[in-house]
């Protein structure tokens, strides 16, 4: 049995190695693979591109955590464990890192589509099996490990806030951040891009628009939270402006476009006079 397990790990290791040879493993610390499960090879494609932040939507369906955006019935065998947790665990077992030589956690964002409390209780049960690779909270202390799980969507704030130990954190609402006196519950803050600004990158951004955006990001950073905006224009000019404001994560479904963006130097976006 032990020999078989070791053989499986070797096969996985060489599979990852062969796959990663095709693309240099530069870790894209600011890239966020939105709706990652829609790619041909969920998780693996993102890892191939060096993405350090990955999202999966889940439904609690027949006591399983099914990865899907809608209609989990048609994807009932595509579970969070099979597509994400088990492969990450096996990859770490092979090389002691998710990315060789990269000693920071990657983020696995789990967007909960069903009841917050019921789904979290099942998620908690599943995460226990992989606790050796998961960042943990234990009586006021955070211990970073290879993978940090962050819950978005339907979030069980009260349930998680009462826990003395857990292996998940919360993605806060950037526009209405919760008071987190311990700074140990919410490690991120997100909002829909259009709820912050309407700028699409096709014309100069006003100074006031940019200041407003930068202020949201600055406020989150003072509370120790990484910032992500979703449904952002897929325009490198907008992305560059967001990076100039100090945003932590660029949100996109397009892995190639993100890698290309982070590989190039960009001219500063135009800024119009205040309106």
Task: Locate the predicted segments by residue.
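Bacterial Sec-dependent N-terminal signal peptides
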Residues: 1-26, 275
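Phosphate-group recognition and catalysis centered on beta-loop-alpha active-site segments
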Residues: 23-275
